[in-house]
Amino acid sequence: MSFYGQMVGEDESGYLPSANMFLGGVEGHHGWGKDAVNWYVEAHDTRTNMSRTNYSYTHHIYKDGYYQQGYPLGDAMGGDGQLIAGKVELITEDNQRWSTRLVYAKVNPEDQSINKAFPHADTLKGVQLGWSGDVYQSVRLNTSLWYTNANNSDSDDVGASAGIEIPFSL
């Protein structure tokens, strides 16, 4: 089991970062018979010091703050958000990977117009299911299905994806 974290300071006070944002998590990798299980639980908080809004991702001099053309440069949810996510992945003996990921997030609580990723305050609840496996020698197929419920949006997000990994050596 591992613990990890990140603290980003928007300002400096006494030679140390202040006005901090946080990311933290715990992950595990375990054997389960001939299979393996990987998992993690992670939390993000892009409010300043876990409470102050309209500060870390904005700036009175640099008007774009921590955004580039309206999209967040750091955490994808942008400033003043809170997120908790968890994932469990089963890796079988024949190298198939089955996974489930759950997400709960509160984004843009102050309706900041700069945040084009999430232009309005919203609460998101999502689930993602995945499978990947070797389909020909070392060629791998990755698939995913997801659904995200948005409380304050006209539409929820539903999708599917597929990708192929083809290894090569240089």
What residue spans do the PLM features occupy?
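Exposed, low-structure sequence patches enriched in small/polar residues
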Residues: 1-170
